[in-house]
Amino acid sequence: MTESDRHDTPKGDRRISEGAGASPDESNPTDFAPEEFTPAYTPPLARSGTERPSFGRPAADNKELQERVDNLTARNAKLLDTLKDARQQLVALREEVDRLGQPPSGYGVLLEVQPDATVDVFTSGRKMRLTCSPNIDTETLHKGQTLRLNEALTIVEACEFDTVGEISTLREVLGDGKRALVVGHADEERVVHLAEPLLGEVDGEDGKRRRLRPGDSLLIDTKAGFAFERVPKAEVEDLVLEEVPDVGYEDIGGLGRQIEQIRDAVELPFLHKDLFRDYALRPPKGVLLYGPPGCGKTLIAKAVANSLAKKIAQARGDDAKEAKSYFLNIKGPELLNKFVGETERHIRLIFQRAREKASEGTPVIVFFDEMDSIFRTRGSGVSSDVETTVVPQLLSEIDGVEGLENVIVIGASNREDMIDPAILRPGRLDVKIKIERPDAEAAMDIFSKYLVETLPVHADDLNEFGGDRTACINAMIERVVERMYAESDDNRFLEVTYANGDKEIMYFKDFNSGAMIQNVVDRSKKYAIKSQLETGAPGLRVQHLFDSILDEFAENEDLPNTTNPDDWARISGKKGERIVYIRTLVTGKSSGASRAIDTETNTGQYL
């Protein structure tokens, strides 16, 4: 600044400059330096408010930098994980591409393992000798096993045995024990190899292990010539129920004479074989139980099997609880098959199984229920003549060249007149036992099996006998039987007209059965339960039994309505003069007049 400039400066301005300080260090920096001053540190972000000093870093900036470092570290770790996942996906995709690019594999069935570690395999319709991959141990391979082959026909994997194929019936196992003769469709016979699972024991019907036996159904591969497993066949297993029934003679009422007859026919030959041999007496081969429905034919057959098992166990000194016998319950109608020869085949299998069980010294009872449905008189068929071949098959099994030892055939039927006479002749079904309808004495015995002392009895009924429960139950039974068997107007059931013009009144007692008595007792128990729910007083009363009898009689009102009254009478157990007309006389349940049953107008009803 020149001298003239100093003189030209106003006084006020001079005071301001002098007040700022005389030295340049104390003056304003803008007045000291001709150039702009640059600070040593510039914050990265603009700050609002006053300017910060140019030296040092505050704590807020350090925290912000640390947060940025943490964020970058997290992003870096996430990026590394993403890269790893991408790498794994690339590796998996590469493996998938390599797998898809491989040539297809073939399969074969192992026939034989050679000493030089080569293997005979049946594949693509050819028998070939192949080599194994080093990771295959030939000692662990089994005949019939499925093998996987690569494109060079090298065995690379050992698989399981086949589980699908054709079903054939085993005829016999050949002498070497490794092959079998089987019969396929249309009786085509072939020899097949037995796979490893069939060389030993297989699972039987009862869950026990056993050897293969003729009649077993086998799963086979006809091309490879192998049988892989035994297949349980429902059509045969359902027809034959191997069991030891738990029904004893003491559970059967009113059939004392019939029980004695069948015990003499069945049990004596088994228990006293020496005496029969000394007297040269041949035991009977079969027993026919015939009579009206619901009178205990099946119960007797079961009791025979149970009693026979216990008696033989006792004779041998075995535990009676472990007594063993076989009761083959044959459901007659299910044996019938529309294919020619199938029914006969089932009969052969049944008796073949019975012979196998009997060969162990155990008695076997073959029980044919509803025998008239399958073994009816030859030539009597309307739609088919299936009985012309089924009946001879049974005859040959019972009385053929191949005898039956320890096997008893028991047949049950309510139409014995329809069974072929050749079956009923002596030497086949030798013993014929009629199971009759129960009379009053037998009915009391049957009632005592169901009205037991453990049942709750009403207090009023007990008080009549001084609290004696046994006397009360016996009195109930006597009064109920007297009511059922009374020839009163309330018990009239039918008026029957015979071909000669005679008429006869039939009562409900003429159609009583053990099954009906059980039903009466069950109804009375239901009435006792309902009465207890209504009144709160527990116990069975005589009136409950009387009400049950009325309901049972009323429900049987419609049953005689059949196409042929004579056929109905035969099933019901009434035989003799031919019946041409039936008129119901029930007055309990139906409010209408008595109904007549005419053979000419009522057609198409059930038997």
From Swiss-Prot:
The keyword Coiled coil applies. The keyword ATP-binding applies. Consists of three main regions, an N-terminal coiled-coil domain that binds to protein Pup and functions as a docking station, an interdomain involved in ARC hexamerization, and a C-terminal ATPase domain of the AAA type. HAMAP family: ARC_ATPase. ATPase which is responsible for recognizing, binding, unfolding and translocation of pupylated proteins into the bacterial 20S proteasome core particle. May be essential for opening the gate of the 20S proteasome via an interaction with its C-terminus, thereby allowing substrate entry and access to the site of proteolysis. Thus, the C-termini of the proteasomal ATPase may function like a 'key in a lock' to induce gate opening and therefore regulate proteolysis. Pathway: Protein degradation; proteasomal Pup-dependent pathway. The lineage of its organism: Bacteria, Bacillati, Actinomycetota, Actinomycetes, Mycobacteriales. This is Proteasome-associated ATPase. GO terms for molecular function: ATP binding; ATP hydrolysis activity. InterPro entries: AAA+_ATPase (IPR003593), AAA_ATPase_domain (IPR050168), ATPase_AAA_core (IPR003959), ATPase_AAA_CS (IPR003960), NA-bd_OB-fold (IPR012340), P-loop_NTPase (IPR027417), Prot_ATP_ID_OB_2nd (IPR032501), Prot_ATP_ID_OB_N (IPR041626). One of its GO terms (biological process) is modification-dependent protein catabolic process. It comes from the Bacteria. Residues 1-17 have a biased composition (Basic and acidic residues). ATP binds at residues 294-299. It holds the Pfam family AAA. Belongs to the AAA ATPase family. Residues 606-607 are annotated as: Docks into pockets in the proteasome alpha-ring. Residues 1-65 are annotated as: Disordered. The gene is arc. Keywords: ATP-binding, Chaperone, Coiled coil, Nucleotide-binding, Proteasome. PROSITE patterns: AAA. One of its GO terms (cellular component) is proteasome complex.
